[in-house]
């Protein structure tokens, strides 16, 4: 029987097709030991096989006794080798069977196709696998190598040999003798010897048959535990020895194969006397182990059997059964009497590892006893490893011949090492000597591939004797060695080598043909024809050279010219006679030595240069370029001008021509001369060229405008002009010629509304759209005239002033507007039109009329309510209070005033000027430095009384008459800020919240920078402001107009402190106060307002009362209106009008500076921005500049101007928590102005020092550093400079501040404002900036 084995088919990733077919070394004598050992090693070590070498396994099944040339398989298809990528192979794919020299392979393989066929050798399974157990499969193994080396692969092919029924079962002997006692009972069984069949499976013994038994005996077949079938003879009838003592018959045995095979034997049965008892073994199964190196005669085991009989029937005889193999009978001896088994011959585990011994014990009877002895032969390291070399490269006389240029990892031989020992005694390693270019790479268990690990070189080593060593792992280890010889075949693998890789040689030009230049030589390390060298010129070699093929001599065959070719670079080849031939090369550099055989050459025969006429002296005219094909000094060219021309010079090295003269095209248009070029050769050569220089015109004149000739002219454009009409034409001329004189026009600035367009060629300015109201006024158009000169165009610009209006009624105004527009910066897309054009005034009038109408309705309603609460006689008393007011003009304007003096005296009565003083007193309790000190500011204001009378009320649109009692009600507030509000920050005693009412016909007017005056309401208490440009200061103030000799004080004491001013009404008590509902003065919110009646049923504040005080909730300032000093005008002289008033004019003798607690100096301090005075400083919002402007007695309009910080519009600021104020700005139409408080940007403010004889005056100080004045409270200007208000003003000199408004001509409706200046008595005033003050004229 055979045991089932296993098969592993492995596919390597490299798919290197080489199949070594290793023929299994099987022989008939020791095949059993060999296969058992190989199977064990394969099973244990196969999983450790390294497959990276391209090893695979493939199984095929064949039947034994197969005839010759039967196709078994096709490796190319079965291994899918057709899927291998198409690589560039040195040779075609080959299949090579690898086997040991002397072996006869059972199969063959076609090298080209991979087809496997049987050979003529007989395939006998019973011979190949005689020693293996019957239950295992029988395999035959070979190795096939797939070549070439690029796709090398080693494939192990295992052929499973199937059994056929080629053997008949046979009995151990042809005659079988058996004895049966005569008293044997019926159905008694007696064992017969079994037949043996070499085939396995169904082809083995299957049936026994008894022939001619005469029905006395029968036959039965039983199966042993080992699977063997044993025949048994059955007694069917009683036997009688006296009747018949011998029976003869036949026994037939058959197998199950096809065709069925059988055999027979003669069975002879002898009937004997009775033997009642049978022998019995103590142990029926015994297993023992014995080493294979046990000596002969060694006891294996001792068998014991007993028999109950006595005498002869009790004697036992031991023997081997006929089922014991011949090998076992040969190796073991059984003592028939004692039953001792001993070793008859030396054991070999590698041949048979175990033995089954069936022992019979018989007492002479027919029923012997049976016992099975299993002998296991244990291994000892008694076998040295064996080395089996199977060549992949066919050897020649046991020597492998390898070419020296074989690639790396070329497979040379398959080395198989084996060891018949088991376990570690059979583990074998194989290795080679060191320092050889070969290595062993494992592929299968105990199989290695010998391959080259480095390139072979015949020139260094021609032969190799490789010693292979194999050693097992036993103790002590056993080893074996084998030799493998390799001879290296020379190949043409060495190219010829030149002694130098780069050769340089020089030769003069103009040489003689045939001159030998040099000789080249090379060597070759190969031998024979591979070392024979021929010399050749490379493909890049010029035809001027030739080379001797054998000697390598280089020759120049042509005349060389350095100017054509100054060097040659080519290769020379050395080629051997090998197959294929190898070549190498050397680079040859031939340098040609120059000779001076060429003259300098100009790039042009004649040079023409064009230079501009404005080229400066010694400028660059042009560059002369000259070449010389020679080299070195022979090509060093020097340039010079012939005929000693002094007008021009030339650089001898660079060739740059420069003029020594200034060009003038009108005098001479061209210059001609010759330039000489000479080289530096030993025998020099030279040449010359003509140079012509032409002088050309340049664009050096820009267009000049002749119309308009300057920027200050203007052109009138009627609003009715139709679009497309040419309104003006600009004309510019250019003194250049040609394209340099062609002029083109364009508008580059102004004209933001695209109202005008210009023709770029004619310069005609055309009106593009119909003019509407918004287009009226002055338009400033920036026109550019540029020529078409190259490379840079020149241009000029002019401002064209177009005045869109029906007519020019005031040329002076237009000229002034033009002048102002010229001073303004001009940028593209900037509107040039004047913002103060009459059109904008018309829009303002329209808007003001609508807003004023709404305001008047509200004001009338509030006024009616207020007047109903006042006594009727107050109106008459207020109208009678008129005072003459005198004024001293600004010294800087005295000449202008004196020029107009006579004219005004003829046409006008003397001016009635009203002088009022408004005093603001404030106690800052929260300032630790003030300590209750009070600051009082007194401001005298004068206004021409006849100004209103001269206003043209007929021609100017208005809604009121000059004698209107309330001029301010018709004005409209243009301030972008909310109404003026004052909120108290701290709670105050209600008994001090008293407001002194003034007469109902008082009006407060605000004056802006363009003489536009406005009033916030027609209430008795209205707020006026005066707005100025950013560069000027603004002085907003609240004013209560009053009759002459009247004083009104607004006072808000701290806590329970009473006012120091005499109200004239006795003490104030809360019980006598009545609340009112009308609007508060100065735009104060109506929070708590108290009205108190006098015993004469008159409201407080009438014209007959003494100076009184009015308390405003939340206001911590005391505003006092002082009586005017009319008697001061009696002391004035003509000198006062020119040089200013003296102390005699201002101060009566009765007035004492220290007589009153309120006679503290009050000053309006304009602190210079750079002032660093370290005195008490009050924040600007606290310091208030107040100017009170009185109108003529008709309307008694008072303008109040306040100057906050420069960037703010007019506002009244109180430092929190005293009073919080918001700004109120009025810009009424200019036509409605009845009073003017104007401060131009450069107006010169004068500082007034307090006089000791005048209780309260106003001191103003203007900053000399900036025209924009910032206000700082706490400083006044005295005779000795700046001094603190807390200290008072002690100087005696008096500076004065006045503002005068007057008319220059009766028909002129505009109002002139003469700025004031600072001057001392009897001193000429110094103008601030310029010789005369700047005068601003309102358009109306």
UniProtKB/Swiss-Prot annotation:
Cytoplasmic membrane side: 866-1340
Record topology, Extracellular segments: 29-844
Keyword set, alphabetical order: Calcium, Cell adhesion, Cell membrane, Chromosomal rearrangement, Glycoprotein, Membrane, Repeat, Signal, Transmembrane, Transmembrane helix
Domain Cadherin: 58-171, 172-281, 282-387, 394-498, 499-602, 603-705, 709-827
Molecular function via GO: calcium ion binding
SUPFAM superfamilies cross-referenced by the UniProt entry: Cadherin-like
Signal peptide extent: 1-28
Transmembrane stretches, start-end: 845-865
Disulphide bridges, residue numbers: none
Residue span of region Disordered: 1052-1112, 1321-1340
Compartments in which it is found: Cell membrane
Main location (coarse class): membrane
Tissues in which the UniProt entry reports expression: Expressed strongly in fetal brain and brain (cortex, amygdala, thalamus, substantia nigra, hippocampus, caudate nucleus and corpus callosum). Expressed at low level in testis. Expressed in apoptosis-resistant cells.
SMART domains in the cross-refs: CA
InterPro entries recorded: Cadherin-like_dom, Cadherin-like_sf, Cadherin_CS, Cadherin_N, Protocadherin, Protocadherin/Cadherin-CA
Database matches in Pfam families: Cadherin, Cadherin_2, Protocadherin
Medical condition linked: A chromosomal aberration involving PCDH11Y is a cause of multiple congenital abnormalities, including severe bilateral vesicoureteral reflux (VUR) with ureterovesical junction defects. Translocation t(Y;3)(p11;p12) with ROBO2.
Quaternary structure, from the entry: Interacts with CTNNB1.
Job description of the protein: Potential calcium-dependent cell-adhesion protein.
PANTHER family the UniProt entry points to: CADHERIN-87A, PROTOCADHERIN-11 X-LINKED-RELATED
Protein's name in the database: Protocadherin-11 Y-linked
Species name: Homo sapiens
Gene it is expressed from: PCDH11Y
């Amino acid at each position: 029987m055979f045991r089932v084995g296993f098969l592993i088919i492995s596919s390597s990733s490299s798919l290197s097709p080489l199949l070594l077919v290793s023929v299994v070394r099987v022989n008939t004598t020791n095949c059993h030991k060999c296969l058992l050992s190989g199977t064990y090693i394969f099973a244990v070590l196969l999983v450790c096989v390294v497959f990276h070498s391209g090893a695979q396994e493939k199984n095929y099944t064949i039947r034994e006794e197969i005839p010759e040339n039967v196709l078994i398989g096709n490796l190319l298809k079965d291994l899918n080798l057709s899927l291998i990528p198409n690589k560039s192979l040195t040779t075609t794919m080959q299949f090579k069977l690898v086997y040991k020299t002397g072996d006869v392979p059972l199969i063959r393989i076609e090298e080209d196709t991979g087809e496997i066929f049987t050979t003529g050798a007989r395939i006998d399974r019973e011979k190949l696998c005689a020693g293996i157990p019957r239950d295992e499969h029988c395999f035959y193994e070979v190795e096939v190598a797939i070549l070439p080396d690029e796709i090398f692969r080693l494939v192990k092919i295992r052929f499973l040999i199937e059994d056929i029924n080629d053997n008949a079962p046979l009995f151990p002997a042809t005659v079988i003798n058996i004895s049966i006692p005569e008293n044997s009972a019926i159905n008694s069984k007696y064992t017969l010897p079994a037949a043996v069949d070499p085939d396995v499976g169904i082809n083995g013994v299957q049936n026994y048959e008894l022939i001619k038994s005469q029905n006395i005996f029968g036959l039965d077949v039983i199966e042993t535990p080992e699977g063997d079938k044993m025949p048994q003879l059955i007694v069917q009838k009683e036997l009688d020895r006296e009747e018949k003592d011998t029976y003869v018959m036949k026994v037939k045995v058959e197998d199950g194969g096809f065709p069925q095979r059988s055999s027979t034997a003669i069975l002879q049965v002898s009937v004997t006397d009775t033997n009642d008892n049978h022998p019995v073994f103590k142990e029926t199964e015994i297993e023992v182990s014995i080493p294979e190196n046990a000596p002969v005669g060694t006891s294996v085991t001792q068998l014991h059997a007993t028999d109950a009989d006595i005498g002869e029937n009790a004697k036992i005889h031991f023997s081997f059964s006929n089922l014991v193999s011949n090998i076992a009978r040969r190796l073991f001896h059984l003592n028939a009497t004692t039953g001792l088994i001993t070793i008859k011959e030396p054991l070999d585990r590698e041949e048979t590892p175990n033995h089954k011994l069936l022992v019979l014990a018989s007492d002479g009877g027919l029923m012997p006893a049976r016992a099975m002895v299993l002998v296991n032969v244990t291994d000892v390291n008694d076998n040295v490893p064996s080395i089996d070399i199977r060549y992949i490269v066919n050897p020649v006389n046991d020597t492998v011949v390898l070419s020296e240029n074989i690639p790396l990892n070329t497979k040379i031989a398959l080395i198989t090492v084996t060891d018949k020992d088991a376990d570690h005694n059979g583990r074998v390693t194989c290795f080679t000597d060191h320092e050889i270019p070969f290595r062993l790479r494992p592929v299968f268990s105990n199989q290695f591939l010998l391959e080259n690990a480095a390139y072979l070189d015949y020139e260094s080593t021609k032969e190799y004797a490789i010693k292979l060593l194999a050693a097992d792992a036993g103790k002590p280890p056993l080893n074996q060695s084998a030799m493998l010889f390799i001879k290296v075949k020379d190949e043409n693998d060495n190219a010829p080598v030149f002694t130098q890789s780069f050769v340089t040689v020089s030769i003069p030009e103009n040489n003689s043909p045939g001159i030998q230049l040099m000789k080249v030589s090379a060597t070759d390390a190969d031998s024979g024809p591979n070392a024979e060298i021929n010399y050749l010129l490379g493909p890049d070699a010029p035809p001027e050279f030739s080379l001797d093929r054998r000697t390598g001599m280089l020759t120049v065959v042509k005349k060389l010219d350095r100017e054509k070719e100054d060097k040659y670079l080519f290769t020379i080849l050395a080629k051997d006679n090998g197959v294929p031939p190898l070549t190498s090369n050397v680079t040859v550099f031939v340098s040609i030595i120059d000779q001076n055989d060429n003259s300098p050459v100009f790039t042009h025969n004649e040079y023409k240069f064009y230079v501009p006429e404005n080229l400066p002296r010694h400028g660059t005219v042009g560059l002369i370029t000259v070449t010389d094909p020679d080299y070195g000094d022979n090509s060093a060219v020097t340039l010079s001008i012939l005929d000693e021309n002094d007008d021009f010079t030339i650089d001898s090295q660079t060739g740059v021509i420069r003029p020594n003269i200034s060009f003038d095209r009108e005098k001479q248009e061209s210059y001609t001369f010759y330039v000489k070029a000479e080289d530096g050769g030993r025998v020099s050569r030279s040449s010359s060229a003509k140079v012509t220089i032409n002088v050309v015109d340049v664009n050096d004149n820009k267009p000049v405008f002749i119309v308009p000739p300057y920027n200050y002219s203007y052109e009138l454009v009627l609003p009715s002009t139709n679009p497309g009409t040419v309104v003006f034409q600009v004309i510019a001329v250019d003194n250049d010629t040609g394209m340099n004189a062609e002029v083109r026009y364009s508008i580059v600035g102004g004209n933001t509304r695209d109202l005008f367009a210009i023709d770029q060629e004619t310069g005609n300015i055309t009106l593009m759209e119909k003019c509407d109201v918004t287009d009226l006024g002055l338009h400033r158009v920036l026109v550019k005239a540029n020529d078409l000169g190259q490379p840079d165009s020149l241009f000029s610009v002019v401002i064209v002033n177009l005045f869109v209006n029906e007519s020019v009624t005031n040329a002076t105004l237009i000229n002034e507007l033009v002048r102002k527009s010229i001073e303004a910066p001009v940028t593209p897309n900037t509107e040039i039109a004047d913002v103060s054009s009459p059109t904008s005034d018309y829009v303002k009038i329209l808007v003001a009329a609508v807003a004023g109408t709404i305001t008047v309705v509200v004001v009338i309603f509030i006024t009616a309510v207020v007047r109903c609460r006042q006594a009727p006689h107050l109106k008459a008393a207020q109208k009678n209070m008129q005072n003459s007011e005198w004024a001293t003009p600004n010294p800087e304007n005295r000449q202008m005033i004196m020029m107009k003096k006579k004219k005004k005296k003829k046409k006008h009565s003397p001016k009635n000027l009203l002088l009022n003083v408004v005093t603001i007193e404030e106690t800052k309790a929260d300032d630790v430095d003030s300590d209750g000190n009070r600051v009082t500011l007194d401001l005298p204001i004068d206004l021409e009384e006849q100004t209103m009378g001269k206003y043209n009320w007929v021609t100017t649109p208005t809604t009121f008459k000059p004698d209107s009692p309330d001029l301010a009600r018709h004005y409209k507030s243009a301030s972008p800020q909310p109404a003026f509000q004052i909120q108290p920050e701290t709670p105050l005693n209600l008994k001090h919240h008293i407001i002194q009412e003034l007469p109902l016909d008082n009006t407060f007017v605000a004056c802006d920078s363009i003489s536009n005056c406005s009033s916030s309401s027609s209430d008795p208490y209205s707020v006026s402001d005066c707005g100025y440009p950013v560069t000027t200061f603004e002085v907003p103030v609240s004013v209560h107009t009053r009759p002459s000799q009247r004083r009104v004080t607004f006072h808000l004491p701290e806590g329970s402190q009473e006012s120091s001013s005499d109200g004239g009404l006795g003490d104030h008590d809360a019980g006598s106060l009545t609340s009112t509902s009308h609007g508060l003065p100065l735009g104060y919110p109506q929070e708590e307002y108290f009205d108190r009646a006098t015993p004469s049923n008159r409201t407080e504040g009438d014209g007959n009362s003494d100076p009184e005080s009015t308390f405003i909730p939340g206001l911590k300032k005391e505003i006092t209106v002082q009586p005017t000093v009319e008697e001061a005008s009696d002391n004035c002289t003509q000198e006062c009008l020119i040089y200013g008033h003296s102390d005699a004019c201002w101060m009566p003798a009765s007035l004492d500076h220290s007589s009153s607690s309120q006679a503290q100096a009050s000053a309006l301090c304009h602190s210079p921005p750079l002032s660093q005075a370290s005195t008490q400083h009050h924040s600007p919002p606290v310091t208030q500049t107040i100017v009170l402007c009185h109108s003529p007695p008709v309307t008694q309009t008072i303008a109040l101007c306040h100057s906050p910080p420069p960037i703010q519009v007019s506002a009244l600021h109180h430092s929190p928590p005293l009073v919080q104020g918001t700004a109120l700005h009025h810009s009424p139409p200019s036509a409605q102005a009845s009073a003017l408080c104007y401060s131009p940007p450069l107006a010169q403010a004068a500082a007034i020092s307090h006089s000791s004889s005048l209780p309260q005056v106003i001191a103003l100080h203007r900053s000399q550093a900036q025209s924009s004045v910032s206000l700082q409270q706490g400083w006044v200007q005295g005779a000795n400079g700046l001094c603190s208000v807390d200290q008072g003003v002690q100087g005696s000199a008096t500076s004065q501040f006045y503002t005068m408004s007057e008319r220059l001509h009766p028909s002129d409706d505009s109002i002139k404002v003469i700025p004031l200046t600072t001057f001392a008595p009897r001193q000429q005033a110094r103008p601030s900036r310029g010789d005369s003050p700047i005068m601003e004229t309102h358009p109306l």
